[in-house]
């Protein structure tokens, strides 16, 4: 009898995961979360976003929920509405209540790579809506030591130069190592702190949950190249080596949850990355 009662007794849950899930749900659900990652090599960039999403937002199955295809269709429609092609400021606005910005350790090792990362963060800052939480994530190599304190401090310093006094509040930093569950919990805890700090300043009704979607929207970030003639934007790549980066013209490349990325400016399509997550169960701002 005692053993039966013990079996029926509620078991303590993980200390980090339930608050994280509850806060994400309160902010609109995982379908409202945005991942931003560097674009250096297409498949590797995709794999990084996919691995991170799978570790921090583990798949959960629930009976009676919409299937993958149905959820993917709903998620694509929501992403298309909210994250249209780069253009006017309103069209480029990031309306997600929780944003993860992923960077590799190698992006902090040289002045040029830090400059690129700073430009990415500034672009996200300028597009991010008031009251949103943001977590800068340092991605360590698989098999690396858990301790990445020097690099994490560099990331925090970089975040502080861009977001100012928001760092430590709605802007947090964490280290993530693929294959290390403890690092996934650290990222979740950082997201909890950011969401809790952003909560009081969040405009009422700012976030609306898309219907029946369990998809995360992802961006692979790459600066737009521009001709010396500011009226023309080039997409030729290697043939335009004389072009310079213009901070005012930087833009996030939208990647929809089904993996399709459409640049409405030139009609081309690319597969820069996308992550499918199954549905949930019942300065001085500078």
Curated annotation (Swiss-Prot):
This is Uncharacterized protein C2orf72 homolog. It comes from Mus musculus. InterPro entries: C2orf72-like_C (IPR027868). Residues 69-85 have a biased composition (Low complexity). It comes from the Eukaryota. PANTHER family: HYPOTHETICAL PROTEIN LOC100362216, RIKEN CDNA 2810459M11 GENE. Residues 59-89, 225-286 are annotated as: Disordered.
